Amino acid sequence: MESPIRFADVDINTILKTLPHRFPFLLIDRVKNIREDHSGIGVKNVTFNEPAFQGHFPERPVFPGVLMIEGMAQTAGVIGIMSVTGTEKPRAVYFLTIDKCKFRKPVLPGDTIEYHMKSIGRRKTMWWFHGDAIVDGQTVAEADVGAMLTD
């Protein structure tokens, strides 16, 4: 049984109040279904206008896997901050670890990535999450990420 939803929809304005990231490195558009078990889903709409496509790759644009991992981490940051504070109170989030990372399918312009993140551990200000990046119901990447929240 899924845990109750705490925040149904976190829009871009709330994300901007929560995370320090800005263009071109803000890699989520919204976060939905933040649950009491510290899980949630980040959403990234991939367009041809992404700065990374200028060099990755001009003739056949593929969204870089490392940016998907960063999108997972940003989603986890929003979930962690809002779970701790109950609001979008801004906090610095530092990436600590990436484990068990796998890239399974390319992500192309026009795709919508959903970052399904679930907390797998917490110690004081450090959090660990498992994430699956999903496009059209198929897993395109997965990883375990760790981060630290600071004031």
Swiss-Prot record:
Keywords per UniProt: Cytoplasm, Lipid A biosynthesis, Lipid biosynthesis, Lipid metabolism, Lyase
GO MF term (any one): (3R)-hydroxyacyl-[acyl-carrier-protein] dehydratase activity
Disulfide-bonded cysteines: none
Reaction(s) catalysed (UniProt annotation): a (3R)-hydroxyacyl-[ACP] = a (2E)-enoyl-[ACP] + H2O
InterPro entries reported in the protein's UniProt record: FabA_FabZ (IPR013114), FabZ (IPR010084), HotDog_dom_sf (IPR029069)
Catalytic residues in the record: 56
Top-tier EC class: lyase
UniProt keyword annotation of Lipid biosynthesis present: yes
CDD domains assigned to the protein according to its UniProt record, in alphabetical order: FabZ (cd01288)
Cell location: Cytoplasm
Record EC number: 4.2.1.59
One Pfam family recorded for the sequence: FabA
UniProt main location, coarse: cytoplasm
GO terms of biological process kind: fatty acid biosynthetic process; lipid A biosynthetic process
Any one Gene Ontology cellular component term annotated for this protein: membrane
Domain of life: Bacteria
Signal peptide, first to last residue: none
Its biological purpose: Involved in unsaturated fatty acids biosynthesis. Catalyzes the dehydration of short chain beta-hydroxyacyl-ACPs and long chain saturated and unsaturated beta-hydroxyacyl-ACPs.
Family named by the database record: Belongs to the thioester dehydratase family. FabZ subfamily.
NCBIfam families, per the entry: fabZ (TIGR01750), PRK00006.1 (NF000582)
Protein name stated in the entry: 3-hydroxyacyl-[acyl-carrier-protein] dehydratase FabZ
Species assigned in the record: Rhodopseudomonas palustris (strain HaA2)
Gene: fabZ
